[in-house]
C-alpha cells in the first residue's frame, strides 16, 4: 500500500509518500522522509544564518529630545511595532521605559517633547490623516482610530489624553511646550490648539484664524504665539497675544512667509519669505528667498538678506530642517543655504550685513541642528571628511571652524545637549541604532540592554564603499554587500532608495524606512545575493548639481543611466553571474525598478517594485491638455509605461492602498498593461497600510517576499505565471 501524509516543514506543507506496508518500517521511512525533506532547508538555514524577523528585530530609536532645564533626554523605541517613550538622566544616562504600549498596532509616536524641568513627556500618537481626513488604520480595526496628544509623567502613572490632533500631512505633528511647562500647543485641522499638560481641561482652539495655521512658536515670556497662516497661494506670519486676545500680522504680502522664530529676549522675530511661486526641483522653477526681522518695539519688519536668483540661490527645501533656522546668542540668526552649491550653515547679524559661512567645504549638513544651551554654538550632523557616513560636529555661531565630536566607522545623527553632555543617535555597519553619549574617547551606548540577545550582528557583513562612473562620466557612490560565503557566480541585486533626496550609507540609516531597508539588504546578502545599493544622481550629500540634474525624473530620467552603470559594475565582478542581475526598491526606487525592467529586461532578469511611480504624466492632470504639453510628453517618455512593449522580465508589485505619497492608482493602472503585454508578475496589496509601513509585520512580509521572489526567479529559475489578457 502506498502511504501518504502531509507535514509542515519550514513553514510549508510537504507531501510525504512512503511505499511501505506498516509498522516500524513505515515509521522509519516516514522519519527518513521527513529528514530528507528538512535537509535542504536545514542547509539553507545554516547558510542563511538568521531570519528576516531577526534582521528586523531590533528597537529603532527616533525623536531624541532633551529638557531645557534638566539633564534628561527622551526618545522613542519602535520595537517590532510597539512604540514607547524612554528617558535617561545624566550623567549616567541609564535608560528606562516611560510608556508601556504593547503589540504591533500601527500607532506611531511623533513630536516627542519634554517639559522644561523634564518631569513630563508630551507626544502625538497615531498617524496624520489622508486626503479624506482618515487616520491610518493598518490593522483594519473596525473602530476608526484618531491621532491624539498625550502626556505622561516620567515618575510613573498612565498617560493622560490632552486632545485630538488629526493633522493633515506627513510630518505635520508639531507640539510646542510653553516656557513655564504648563501648556501644550499644537496645530491641526487648520487651527491652533491649547491644552494644560495636567489634562485637567480639554484642549481648546486658541482663536478663530482664517487659513491653515501651522508652525506655532511661543514667545520667551509665554505671552504671545507666532505662527504661519497658510492662505493657499501666499502665507502670512501672525502673532496672537494672550493678554489682549488680539491678532497681528507681520508685514503681510503676496509671498510665502514661514518659520517664525523669536530672539532669546523676545524683542525680535525672524522669518523666511519665499519670493518665487511654487518651487521644487520637479517643477523646474527657481525659488529665491529672503530673511526678514520684525522688531517688536517699532512694529516694523525689514529684509536683512536675499538669496541670488539662480539655482544655487533657490531655497534648499529638499534638505531643510526647520530647526536650522533660529535665533542664536549675540543677536545672530542661523540659516541654511546652498549658495556655493552645497547645503551649509550660515549666520548673519539680526541687523543685516554679510552672512558668515560656518561650514565651508565640499560636503553638506543633514539632520537635526541644535543650539548649545548658551546659544553660542551649533551641534549638527554632516558628511564632512566621510562622504558616505555622517558624524556630529560643533561650530560657533560667530566663527567658522567646525570641530568633529565623533568620527570613525560609525554613523551619528540628531545631536542634543543634556546638562554638559552631548547625546546623539548612532549606528554602525553591523550594529543597529541606539542613543549614545558622546565622550572625548568616542561614544557610550545608552539603553543597550534593549537590543535583543539573539540579534545577529556578528553575522552581518560590512558593506564596501564603491565609486563607479556613469556613461556621462559622473561619479556614483554605492555600498556593496558581499555575502560572507558565496558561490563562484552569485546572483546580484541593484537597490535604489526612495525620495529621491536621500542617501544610503555604510551602516544603519537614520530614517525608519531606510533603516529597515538597510537591514533587508543585509538579509539578502545572508541569502547569498550580492547587493549594490546605489546613490544615483538626485541623491543628497554630493552637491546641488548632483541632486538637481537638468534632465532628472519626469524631465528625462537621466538618473537611469546610473542604474545601468551599477548593473554593469556588478556584471564585471568575478564572483557575480552577469546573467542573474535583479533590482529592487521602494517609492522612487520602485519607479527605477520598473524603469529598469521596462527598458532593459535584457540586463535585469527580475525586479521587486514597492510603491513605485509608473506614469509621470498622470501628475500633469491627464486629458488633452496634458497630452499636448511638452512637459507631459517628456514625463511620459521618462516613465516605465512608455517602454511596456520591451518589458519581459518578471516583477513583484507591492503597495499599500492607503498610500499618501504615491497614488495607489499607479499600480492599479500598471497591472492591466502588464496583463495585456503578457508580462509575468505577482502582486501583493496591503489594505489600509500607508507608504512607509506602520506595521512591523508588513515590513517582514515585504522583505520576506522580496527574498523569496528573487530566490525563485534568479536562483532556481522558476517561471512566474504570465496572466493572459482579460477578454
Which functions belong to the PLM regions below?
Residues 19-22, 26-42:
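Bacterial N-terminal signal peptides
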Residues 51-84:
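Beta-strand-rich domains and repeat architectures in extracellular enzymes and scaffolds
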Residues 68-69, 116-117, 179-180, 220-221, ...:
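Residue-level detector of Asp-centered blade-edge/turn motifs that repeat once per structural unit
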Residues 73, 121, 181-184, 225, ...:
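Hydrophobic beta-strand positions that form the internal "hydrophobic ladder"
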Residues 76-86, 101-108, 123-150, 159-172, ...:
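A flexible loop/linker signature enriched in serine peptidases of the S9 family
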Residues 89-93, 153-157, 196-200, 241-245, ...:
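Short loop/turn segments that connect beta-strands within beta-propeller blades
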Residues 322, 336, 404, 411-727:
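Serine-hydrolase catalytic core recognition
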Amino acid at each position: 500500500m502506498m502511504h501518504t501524509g502531509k507535514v509542515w516543514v519550514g513553514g510549508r506543507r510537504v507531501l510525504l509518500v512512503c511505499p511501505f506496508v506498516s509498522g516500524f518500517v513505515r515509521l522509519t521511512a516516514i522519519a527518513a522522509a521527513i529528514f530528507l525533506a528538512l535537509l535542504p532547508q536545514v542547509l539553507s538555514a545554516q547558510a542563511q544564518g538568521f531570519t528576516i524577523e531577526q534582521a528586523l528585530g531590533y528597537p529603532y530609536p527616533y525623536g531624541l529630545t532633551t529638557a531645557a532645564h534638566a539633564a534628561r533626554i527622551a526618545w522613542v523605541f519602535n520595537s517590532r511595532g510597539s512604540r514607547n517613550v524612554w528617558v535617561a538622566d545624566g550623567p549616567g544616562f541609564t535608560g528606562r521605559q516611560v510608556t508601556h504600549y504593547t503589540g504591533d498596532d500601527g500607532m506611531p509616536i511623533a513630536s516627542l517633547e519634554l517639559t522644561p524641568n523634564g518631569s513630563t513627556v508630551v507626544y502625538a500618537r497615531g498617524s496624520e490623516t489622508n486626503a479624506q481626513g482618515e487616520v491610518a488604520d493598518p490593522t483594519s480595526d473596525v473602530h476608526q482610530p484618531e491621532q491624539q496628544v498625550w502626556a505622561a509623567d516620567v515618575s510613573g502613572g498612565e498617560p493622560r489624553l490632552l486632545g485630538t490632533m488629526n493633522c493633515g500631512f506627513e510630518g505635520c505633528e508639531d507640539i510646542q511646550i510653553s516656557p513655564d511647562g504648563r501648556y501644550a500647543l499644537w496645530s491641526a485641522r487648520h487651527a491652533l490648539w491649547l491644552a494644560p499638560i495636567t489634562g485637567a481641561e480639554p484642549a481648546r482652539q486658541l482663536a478663530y484664524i482664517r487659513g491653515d495655521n501651522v508652525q506655532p512658536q511661543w514667545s520667551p515670556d509665554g505671552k504671545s504665539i507666532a505662527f504661519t497662516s497658510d492662505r493657499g497661494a501666499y502665507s502670512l506670519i501672525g502673532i496672537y497675544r494672550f493678554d489682549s486676545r488680539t491678532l497681528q500680522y507681520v508685514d503681510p504680502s503676496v509671498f510665502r512667509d514661514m518659520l517664525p522664530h523669536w530672539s532669546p529676549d523676545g524683542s525680535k522675530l525672524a522669518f523666511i519669505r519665499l519670493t518665487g511661486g511654487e518651487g521644487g526641483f520637479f517643477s523646474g522653477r527657481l525659488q529665491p528667498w529672503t530673511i526678514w526681522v520684525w522688531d517688536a518695539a517699532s512694529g516694523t519688519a525689514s529684509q536683512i538678506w536675499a538669496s541670488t536668483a539662480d539655482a544655487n540661490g533657490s531655497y534648499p527645501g529638499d534638505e531643510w530642517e526647520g530647526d536650522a533656522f533660529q535665533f542664536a546668542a549675540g543677536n545672530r540668526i542661523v540659516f541654511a543655504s546652498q549658495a556655493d552649491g552645497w547645503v551649509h550653515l550660515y549666520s548673519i547679524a539680526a541687523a543685516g550685513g554679510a552672512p558668515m559661512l560656518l561650514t565651508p567645504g565640499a560636503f553638506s549638513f543633514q539632520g537635526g541642528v541644535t543650539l548649545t544651551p548658551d546659544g553660542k554654538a551649533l551641534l549638527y550632523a554632516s558628511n564632512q571628511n566621510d562622504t558616505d557616513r555622517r558624524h556630529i560636529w560643533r561650530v560657533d555661531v560667530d566663527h567658522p571652524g567646525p570641530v568633529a565630536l565623533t568620527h570613525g566607522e560609525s554613523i551619528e545623527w540628531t545631536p542634543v545637549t543634556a546638562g554638559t553632555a552631548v547625546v546623539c543617535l548612532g549606528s554602525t555597519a553591523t550594529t543597529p541604532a541606539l542613543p549614545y553619549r558622546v565622550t572625548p574617547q568616542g561614544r557610550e551606548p545608552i539603553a543597550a540592554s534593549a537590543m535583543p540577545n539573539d540579534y545577529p550582528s556578528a553575522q552581518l557583513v560590512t558593506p564596501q564603499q564603491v565609486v563607479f562612473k556613469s556613461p556621462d562620466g559622473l561619479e556614483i557612490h554605492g555600498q556593496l554587500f558581499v555575502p560572507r560565503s558565496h558561490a563562484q557566480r552569485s546572483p546580484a541585486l541593484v537597490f535604489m532608495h526612495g525620495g529621491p533626496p536621500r542617501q544610503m550609507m555604510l551602516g544603519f540609516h537614520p530614517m525608519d524606512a531606510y533603516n529597515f531597508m538597510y537591514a533587508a539588504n543585509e538579509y539578502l546578502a545572508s541569502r547569498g545575493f550580492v547587493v549594490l545599493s546605489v546613490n544615483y544622481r538626485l541623491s543628497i550629500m554630493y552637491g546641488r548639481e548632483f541632486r538637481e540634474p537638468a534632465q532628472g525624473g519626469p524631465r528625462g530620467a537621466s538618473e537611469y543611466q546610473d542604474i545601468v552603470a551599477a548593473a554593469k559594475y556588478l556584471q564585471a565582478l568575478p564572483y557575480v553571474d552577469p546573467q542573474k542581475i535583479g533590482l529592487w526598491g521602494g517609492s522612487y526606487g520602485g519607479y527605477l525598478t520598473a524603469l529598469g525592467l521596462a527598458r532593459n529586461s535584457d540586463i535585469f532578469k527580475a525586479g521587486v517594485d514597492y510603491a513605485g511611480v509608473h506614469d509621470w504624466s498622470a501628475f500633469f492632470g491627464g486629458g488633452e491638455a496634458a497630452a499636448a504639453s511638452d512637459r507631459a510628453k517628456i514625463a511620459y517618455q521618462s516613465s516605465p509605461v512608455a517602454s511596456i512593449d520591451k518589458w519581459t522580465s518578471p516583477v513583484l508589485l507591492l503597495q499599500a492602498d492607503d498610500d499618501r505619497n504615491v497614488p495607489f492608482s499607479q499600480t492599479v493602472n500598471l497591472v492591466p498593461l502588464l496583463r495585456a503585454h503578457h508580462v509575468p508578475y505577482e502582486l501583493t496589496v496591503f489594505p489600509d497600510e500607508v507608504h512607509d509601513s506602520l506595521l512591523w509585520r508588513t515590513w517582514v512580509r515585504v522583505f520576506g517576499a522580496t527574498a523569496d521572489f528573487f530566490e525563485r526567479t534568479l536562483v532556481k529559475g522558476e517561471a512566474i505565471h504570465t496572466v493572459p489578457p482579460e477578454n
